[in-house]
Amino acid sequence: MKRLNKLVLYISFLILVISFTAGCGIGKEAEVKKSFEKTLSMYPIKNLEDLYDKEGYRDDEFDKNDKGTWIIGSEMVVQPKGERMKSKGMVLYMNRNTKTTTGKYIVSETLHDEDGRPKSKDKEYPVKMVDNKIIPTKGIKDENIKKEIENFKFFAQYGSFKDLSKYKDGDISYNPEVPSYSAKYQLTNDDYNVKQLRKRYKIPTNKAPKLLLKGSGDLKGSSVGYKDIEFTFVEKKGENTFFTDSLHLEPSEDK
């Protein structure tokens, strides 16, 4: 009888531990989603100049007279099997104090030196935004690059995360010492955002991507750190296809 009672107590304890662990996982997943929700709920931002009038997270790092600078970036990275990794993307710095925007369009290719070590070869094209149009600030001979810049759209302009709750049973990671956190979800090719990416980019795989929400800093909010989203289609040695996007407010350098 004593053995039976001990067995019952042991099983009850295991159930309690499993329930507690599962509860913590669900709670942390909700926290990660909430940390991204304020920014992602603004998507799509069709007119980027609307960001001049949008508030972001502020803390003691900001001067009281500083409205902050929005930093927005999108990049597509493709490496077919056995080939070089190539990427194209853009980053803009949108100063809310002066309502001016500058940035750069970046074309990158990963090469290898004589010892086989990877080395990135980047070409940067300075840009500015006027009347919601992105234009080069220097002459560009390559007409294809010029068109890519003029037609460039950030994911924040067409992506949609109106209902983060639809993403469930994610792979959650949290390290309070760094601190860093992430949530990963398997998507389908029927997902709205996946369709939008395939519409705009030549993605050399039919595999449905995983959505990764990753960040660093205080989960409740911080101007120090980052919050990125990534759509990973392929991730293996010598073959990669992924898209990254970020939007966050930082203290302005002119303050």
Swiss-Prot record:
<keyword id="KW-0449">Lipoprotein</keyword>
<feature type="signal peptide">
    <location>
        <begin position="1"/>
        <end position="23"/>
    </location>
</feature>
<dbReference type="GO" id="GO:0005886">
    <property type="term" value="C:plasma membrane"/>
</dbReference>
<dbReference type="InterPro" id="IPR038641">
    <property type="entry name" value="Csa_sf"/>
</dbReference>
<protein>
    <recommendedName>
        <fullName>Uncharacterized lipoprotein SAOUHSC_00055</fullName>
    </recommendedName>
</protein>
<keyword id="KW-0732">Signal</keyword>
<keyword id="KW-1003">Cell membrane</keyword>
<dbReference type="InterPro" id="IPR007595">
    <property type="entry name" value="Csa"/>
</dbReference>
<feature type="lipid moiety-binding region" description="N-palmitoyl cysteine">
    <location>
        <position position="24"/>
    </location>
</feature>
<feature type="lipid moiety-binding region" description="S-diacylglycerol cysteine">
    <location>
        <position position="24"/>
    </location>
</feature>
<keyword id="KW-0564">Palmitate</keyword>
<dbReference type="Pfam" id="PF04507">
    <property type="entry name" value="DUF576"/>
</dbReference>
<comment type="similarity">
    <text>Belongs to the staphylococcal tandem lipoprotein family.</text>
</comment>
<keyword id="KW-0472">Membrane</keyword>
